[in-house]
Amino acid sequence: MKQRRRHVKPKQKFVERVLEFTIESMDSMGQGVAKIDNKPCFIPKTLPGEEGKAILTKASKGVMFARLASLDITADNREESACKHFESCPGCHYLHTDYQSELLYKHQALDNHLKRLTAPVPVVKVVPAEERLGYRNRIQLHYRHKYIGMIDG
């Protein structure tokens, strides 16, 4: 008896498109979140209140991901990164903002996660580090296909 062949739809080629955005909030990973077509769009290296253009890199039914192309309006708390590798390295997520804002965003992310718990949670204080840079002593390498290292999306 012959087996039937499955009909497999050919994959549609993903088309990158330019998006105009206004960042409304930050997620827990330090990415700016904008609403585009009523879907959340995550754009790394952006801050709340910023407006500009981004290039769509991935989209699914309920969420989009994009990379920053240009900023038309920047946030007041945006700073030049102190690390020369910030643009290409996926390690640090908040070096484009001042340290007080970084602590605030991290505190908000922690609060949002803790609010989802059913048990009451005490107020947690975020303690600033003595040094903002130069304290890391390990890295996490990523693997994709045959490549290992710091792989950017």
Task: For every predicted segment, state its role.
Residues 1-153:
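Non-catalytic accessory regions of SAM-dependent methyltransferases
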